[in-house]
């Protein structure tokens, strides 16, 4: 009699995806972030579901309903802060996951990579709409500023913005629809994750060397499940420390002021995980140009497989590309810092230089460095 794990239609899907999955023996802890992202998504859906039971998507009561959750609902405060800081953890894991893909050449699995980019856009949209829901000052003005960017689209821009708002400004209709989208998108993301894994399991995992490892595979369970559990414990520890000791560390104090359309905050800025893109947006004086740069700052990931000029897949043995990669990381951190600063000298010029560097490294320097490294191989 065959093992039910391998014969039952449901369990054999789980078995081939998480138990008997052949996995390269050499993959490092950088490969933990996929499973951590899955855990983050599960935590966000669970905490979000319980928050939605007590939240009201109405401009007159939204702010008070969040206060009610924190004060009156049993363990409501932990739900709220797990959800808010869970989003930060989600993005930390996302950026590390994408960075791993860039460094080790995982983008050569183009289907997996492209589904991943769509997932990144979906998660960013979900997080943006979630930030609007508490209806604080930064929620309202963030929603106003970011949705208003669509008015830069020629001809249809103004109509498009008013259609999204459901009126002539961000108001009750906007909040209601943002709540609806914020609720449904994580389930769409879950379906996209399955497609992401489907494409990944067609090719198998990459490994740090970038060399095919078909002759050196081990089962996912128990070897990598144990490794993933360690990563999970470390992430949950970090999240719980953040939630218990300084839950507002990554938030904006302005969001504790109820939304007031008549009073603009001195510095409108999104959550920290969007600041790098916001800095790129602000560094271009033209509105349409800024919006294009904002979209391209993420969409540029889609053309990275086309820019791969190296004979080697991974950067493991490519020191020039490694230097450029870490320069790109430093540049993104600089952009994140600039995005949170006021629009004044010297921040404007630093932001513009960092934005030029961001696109130059990806589009020009990295492909050229790869070609140079190809020549060095011949020596």
UniProtKB/Swiss-Prot annotation:
Q: Where can this protein be found? A: Mitochondrion inner membrane
Q: What is the lineage of its organism?
A: Eukaryota, Metazoa, Chordata, Craniata, Vertebrata
User: Family, per the entry?
Assistant: Belongs to the cytochrome b family.
Kindly list the positions annotated as binding heme b b562. 83, 182
What organism is the protein native to?
A: Natalus jamaicensis
**Subunit composition and interactions:** The cytochrome bc1 complex contains 11 subunits: 3 respiratory subunits (MT-CYB, CYC1 and UQCRFS1), 2 core proteins (UQCRC1 and UQCRC2) and 6 low-molecular weight proteins (UQCRH/QCR6, UQCRB/QCR7, UQCRQ/QCR8, UQCR10/QCR9, UQCR11/QCR10 and a cleavage product of UQCRFS1). This cytochrome bc1 complex then forms a dimer.
Which regions span the lipid bilayer?
33-53, 77-98, 113-133, 178-198, 226-246, 288-308, 320-340, 347-367
Annotated positions binding a ubiquinone: 201
List the protein's name.
Answer: Cytochrome b
Q: Name one GO cellular component term.
A: mitochondrial inner membrane
This protein's source sits in the domain of life called Eukaryota
């Amino acid at each position: 009699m065959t093992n039910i794990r391998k014969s039952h239609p449901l369990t054999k899907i789980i078995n081939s995806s998480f138990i008997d999955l052949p996995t390269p023996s050499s993959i490092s802890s950088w490969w933990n972030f996929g499973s951590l992202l899955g855990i983050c998504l599960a935590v966000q859906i669970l905490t979000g579901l319980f928050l939605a039971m007590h939240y009201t998507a109405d401009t007159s009561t939204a702010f008070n309903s969040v206060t009610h959750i924190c004060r009156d609902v049993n363990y409501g405060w932990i739900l709220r802060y797990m959800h808010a800081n869970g989003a930060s953890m989600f993005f930390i894991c996302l950026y590390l996951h994408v960075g791993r893909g860039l460094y080790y050449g995982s983008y050569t699995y183009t289907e997996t990579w492209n589904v991943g980019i769509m997932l990144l856009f979906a998660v960013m949209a979900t997080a943006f709409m979630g930030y609007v829901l508490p209806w604080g000052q930064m929620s309202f003005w963030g929603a106003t500023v970011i949705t208003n960017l669509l008015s830069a689209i020629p001809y249809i821009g103004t109509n498009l913005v008013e259609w999204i708002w459901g009126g002539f400004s961000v108001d009750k209709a906007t909040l209601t629809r943002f709540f609806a989208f914020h609720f449904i998108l994580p389930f769409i993301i879950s379906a996209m994750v399955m497609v992401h894994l489907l494409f990944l399991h067609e090719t198998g995992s990459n490994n740090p060397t970038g060399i095919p490892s078909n002759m050196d595979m081990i089962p996912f369970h128990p070897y990598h499940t144990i490794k993933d559990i360690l990563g999970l414990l470390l992430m949950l520890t970090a999240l719980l420390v953040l939630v218990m000791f300084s839950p507002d560390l990554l938030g904006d104090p302005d969001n504790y002021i109820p939304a007031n359309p008549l009073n603009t905050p001195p510095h409108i800025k999104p959550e920290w995980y969007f600041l790098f893109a916001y800095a790129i947006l602000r560094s271009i004086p033209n509105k349409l140009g800024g919006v294009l740069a904002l979209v391209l700052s993420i969409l540029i990931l889609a053309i990275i497989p086309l820019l791969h000029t190296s004979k080697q897949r991974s950067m493991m043995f490519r020191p020039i590309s490694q230097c450029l990669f870490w320069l790109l990381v430093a540049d993104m951190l600089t952009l994140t810092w600039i995005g949170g600063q006021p629009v004044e000298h010297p921040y404007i010029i630093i932001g513009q230089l960092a934005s030029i560097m961001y696109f130059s490294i990806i589009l020009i320097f990295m492909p050229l460095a790869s070609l140079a490294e190809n020549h060095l191989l011949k020596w």
